[in-house]
Structures are given as C-alpha cells and as structure tokens.
Swiss-Prot record:
Role according to the record: Required for transport of secretory proteins from the Golgi complex. Catalyzes the transfer of phosphatidylinositol and phosphatidylcholine between membranes in vitro.
Cellular component per GO, a single term: Golgi membrane
Top-level taxonomy: Eukaryota, Viridiplantae, Streptophyta, Embryophyta, Tracheophyta
Full protein name: Phosphatidylinositol/phosphatidylcholine transfer protein SFH14
The organism of origin for this protein: Arabidopsis thaliana (Mouse-ear cress)
Subcellular location: Golgi apparatus membrane; Cell membrane
Coiled coil regions, renumbered to chain: 523-550
Domain CRAL-TRIO, residue spans: 136-311
Cited CDD domains: SEC14
C-alpha cells in the first residue's frame, strides 16, 4: 500500500464528487485520442511490437482541360438521361477517350458508347477476368511471344510483341480465334483495371495509356496467312471500337530494309496522322533510342536493355511491373473498396477531399501553440500528417492522354488546414489532450489554425499572378496541339483496314490456286518437242550404225595388217634359204 493510504489521507466527499466527472472526461478524451492516433502509422518510424499495416492512399495528380471537362460533363448528362452510364463505367478518362475518337461530337459518341455497352453485355466482358480461363497460354506464348514487362520513364506499362517469331499456323493448332480474342479482351480489362491503376499509384500521377514495342526481326511471308489476317482484323475491330485512345506511343524495332521500304509505307496509307505521329520505326542499330523513353533496367536484353528475368519463359513471361507489388495492389484494392468518387464538374485549381477518410498521425500531441507535424516519404517529397483520398481533378491544360501534371501545393495545404479544423472540432469537442493528460481549451488551437489559414491565403494571392502567367503559357500550345491532332473517325479507319485485309485474302486465294494448278505446255510446243525427240532418237540410231560400221572397218583393217605382216615374214625366210 502507498504511504498516502497508510496514513489514511483520503479525499473529502465534495472533492471526490468534483474529481470523478473530471476523471471520466479525461478517460473519454484519452480513449478518443488513442483510437484516432492509431489510425495511421508513420512509414519511416520504427515501432516496438507487431507492426500494424494501414494503407494510406497517395495523392494522384491529374490535370484536365477546361473545355474537355465541359464536353465530358455534357456527355455524362446525356448518358445519364438515357440510362447508359453504369457506375462501373462512370469514369472521366473513359468518357474522354470516346469523345476524342468521335472528334468531340456528342451524338456520335453516345452512339459509339451504346454499341460498346451492348458488345460488353453480349461478349460477357464485365465478368471475363473471373469467368474465362485461358489454359493454353503457355503454348500460345511459345508460338506468339508477347507480354507486359516494366514501365517507361513516365510510368506507363510496356507491352512487347515479337512478331518475327510468331507462327499463326502453329498458333491455331493450340487455340481458336474465338478463344484468343477472349484472351485479348481479358488482358485489356486487366490492363485497365489493374495495371494502369497500379502504375498511377507508383508514379503518383494519372496513367491512362500504354507504350507498345513491336519487334519485327525475322518478319516475312510465313507470318502473313489467311488465319493471321482474320485474327488481326478481329482484334483491330475490338481495339478501335471498344478500347480507343489507349496507346501513347509505339516503337517498331529491328525494322529491316524490306519493312522500311515496302511494308511501312503501305501501312501509313491506312493510318491517320495522329497515329503515325505516335509510331517510331527503329533500325537494328538504333535500339539505343529506346533508352530515351525507357530505363535500361525495364528493357529486356534482346531489346538492348539490362533485364534478364530468371523465370521460365524469360522477360515476356515475367509480367514485371508495379501491378505485382503487394503493397501497391493492396492500395489499389483499398481505393476500389472505398469507392473514391469521380468528379467531372469541379472547377480548375480546386481539389475535393473526402474528410471521412482522413487519418491522424499516431504520435500527434497538441500543445498551446502546436506546430503542424511533417514527415518525408520514401520518394523525398514532403507530406502533411493528414493524408486523404484525393479524387483526381484538373489544374491546368493537359496533353492528349492527361499524363503531364502540375502540383498545386498551396491549394492542398489550404484544404488540409480546413480538414484539420473540422476534424479537431468533431473529435476533441473543443478540447485538446496532451500525453500528460492536461486539458487545454480549444480557443488557442482554433486561433493557431486561423492564423495558418490566413498565411496560406496570403501565400496563394502572392503566387496567383505567376500561376496565371504559367497557365497562359501552357494553354496556347495545348490549344494548337489539340487543333492539329484531329482524330480520324473510327469507322473510316476500320473500313480501310478491312478493305486491305480483303485484298490480301484475294491475293492469297489467287496464289493458292496458281500453286495448285499443274504446269501445261501448249500443243504446238509439245509437237515441236516431240519432233525434236524423234530427231534425237533417229540421230542416236544413225550414230549407233556408224559406230558399228566403224568397228567392222577397224577389225578388217587389223586383219589386213596382220596378213601383210605374215607375208613379209614368209618372204624374208625364203630369201635366207
């Protein structure tokens, strides 16, 4: 027992009655502060005991054009009126891709959107990731090497195909066009639902497009068959109609003289100028240009990089990328579970914050004049102790794929200060708690927060003219870029591609018929040939007769010679006697 208990020192009844509510209030406030402080753990601070993982959604920056936002908003309203906008497809960037394909004509876009929804329902696209199992994937990739591997310097996923090593005939022996098309759509859905969000989290900015590398080394007539033509036509139709504007750039590497002289000029006639501008053809000795856009650690060795994936199948089967990082996958899943809203009508230079998802640092202590606690993330950027789920909104004009971003630190800090104000009012009920249990009034804290808001307001007013100048600097080039990059309607491009495939089919049929026909010589030539053969035979007979006569003559000559020699010898013997 303590000394106070031994001496019998106790509080009086009145002191005990006054002390009991005070203790209960302190206990409640301690519980609130403890429960609130354990929501977020600092990523770089070591804690004793078992580590509690709490997923913190990073700030993903996104810049949008004001005119494009208005058009997307109009399109969204029309789709909602016609009940053509399911929540799963209510995405700003998806709507913008269809608008760009249809030259920002809303009526055509609504028609294309309706066709897309109808196709997804008939094809079962919404459930294809869960329902479809492509068992023959290993054999297919053996006859048609392809796959995702790494990201470029802007954080976009890289898709690689080795067309020169594709064997369409062997490919159709292990699968069918229908099953391969389902696999193609399944991979597209995985890219949109898993790979692009993971790349956005890793790059901390919105990623909506991909980078493609086509290796045409060894490409020849063996790769152009009717089966390959049908497969390419089907895939091109799906990509153009239902997944438009997903390509950022394409590199065609190891292009020989034949490809650059014949195939590429013919292909350019079927492509619009904007698509041609996205494609870069590289010679075998120009592979080093890939390193300007892609880090060497993200490139396979056969493309001039340093990556040697040890798994079976090499780099193309490794599926290397941020989408395989468990922490990033959990973050993406956490964003989907929290159902982060997509804002389409918010003005520029404004970001909406979801205050219900804010979390507080575990070691946050409030004093009479508290200073806002800050820490540095693993990438070196400074963050506030309050981290919120931030839906991407626009700040300045963007490029065609929305991947160039401009940070608005002042507006973010101002919003975070307002969140701190609201969170403190709701949580601490005009009181603040220190570790020692001392109770302080909320007035000092509120006064400090108001002074910080005034400081941020003055900061914004001072920086606003500079931002306005920068805005005009980005707006004018972006306007001319959008004016010069007009997308050719999808239907005409698709028709041209189909016409080209039809011509290719006709040529292949004619070639097959010609190869099957037996070679026939004209009758006149056959007669001449027969007469020549008869003459040759008669000459051969005459030659044989001549040879026999000559042989007989030679034998007679030898006999005569022998007779003459014998007569000479007899004469010589007679003379001697």
């Amino acid at each position: 027992m303590s000394g106070r208990e031994q001496t019998g020192e106790k509080l009086s009844d009145s002191e005990y009655i006054e002390e009991e509510p005070r203790r209960s209030r302190i206990g409640n406030l301690k519980k609130k502060a403890f429960s609130c402080s354990t929501k977020l753990t600092h990523p770089l601070k070591m804690r004793k005991g078992k580590r509690k993982i709490d997923f913190q959604i990073p700030l993903i920056e996104d810049v949008r054009d004001e005119k494009e936002e208005k058009l997307v908003s109009k399109l969204r309203q029309q789709l909602l009126q016609k009940d053509l906008l399911p929540p799963v497809h209510d995405d700003y960037h998806m709507l913008l891709r269809f608008l760009k394909t249809m030259e920002f004509k809303i009526e055509k876009t609504v028609t294309a959107w309706e066709e897309m929804l109808k196709w997804r329902k008939e094809f079962g696209t919404d459930r294809i990731i869960q329902d479809f199992n492509f068992k023959e994937l290993d054999e297919v990739t053996r006859h048609y090497p392809q796959g995702y591997h790494g990201v470029d310097k802007d954080g976009r996923p890289i898709y690689i195909e080795r067309l020169g090593k594709a064997h369409p005939g062997k490919l159709m022996e292990v699968t069918t066009i229908e099953r391969y098309l389902k696999y193609h759509v399944q991979e597209f859905e995985r890219t949109l639902q898993e790979k692009l969000p993971a790349c956005s989290v890793a790059a901390k900015r919105r990623v909506t497009t991909t980078t493609t590398i086509l290796d045409v080394e060894g490409l020849g007539m063996k790769n152009f068959t009717p089966t390959a033509a049908n497969l390419l036509a089907t895939i091109a139709k799906v990509d153009c109609n239902y997944y438009p504007e997903t390509l950022h750039r394409m590199f065609i590497v190891n292009a020989g003289i034949g490809f650059r002289s014949f195939l590429w000029p013919a292909a350019q006639k079927l492509l619009d100028p904007m698509t041609i501008a996205k494609i870069q053809v590289l010679e075998p000795r120009s592979l080093s240009k890939l390193l300007e856009a892609i880090d060497s650690s993200q490139l396979p060795e056969f493309l001039g990089g340093l990556c040697k994936c040890p798994n079976e199948g090499g780099c193309l089967r490794s599926n290397k990328g941020p989408w395989n990082d468990p922490e990033i996958v959990e973050l993406v899943h956490h964003m989907e579970v929290n159902n982060v809203p997509q804002t389409t009508t918010a003005p520029l230079h404004v970001r909406d914050y979801d205050s219900t998802t804010c979390t507080i640092s575990p070691k946050e202590t409030l004093k009479e004049e508290p200073e806002p606690e800050e820490y540095y993330s693993s990438t070196g950027s400074r963050s506030s102790m309050h981290t919120c789920i931030v839906p991407p909104l626009s700040d300045k004009a963007s490029t065609s794929d929305g991947d160039k971003f401009i940070t608005t630190v002042e507006s973010i800090e101002s919003a975070q200060s307002q969140l701190l104000d609201a969170d403190t009012e709701n949580t601490f009920a005009n009181t603040s708690v220190r570790e020692g249990g001392q109770i302080l009034r909320f007035g000092a804290l509120r006064e400090k927060i108001n002074s910080e808001n005034i400081f941020h307001l003055v900061k914004i007013l001072l920086v606003f003219p500079l931002k306005l100048f920068v805005l005009f600097g980005f707006l004018l080039p972006g306007y001319w870029q959008r004016q010069n990059t007009v997308v050719v309607p999808d239907s005409s491009t698709n028709n041209k591609v189909l016409e080209c495939f039809d011509r290719l089919k006709k040529m292949e049929k004619e070639f097959t018929e010609i190869s099957r026909k037996q070679v026939k010589i004209p009758e006149a030539n056959e007669k001449l040939l027969a007469e020549s053969l008869e003459r040759i035979k008669s000459l051969e007979l005459d030659l044989d007769k001549t040879k026999s006569v000559l042989h007989i003559t030679l034998t007679k000559q030898l006999q005569i010679t022998e007779q003459l020699e014998s007569q000479d010898e007899e004469r010589r013997k007679g003379c001697c006697f």
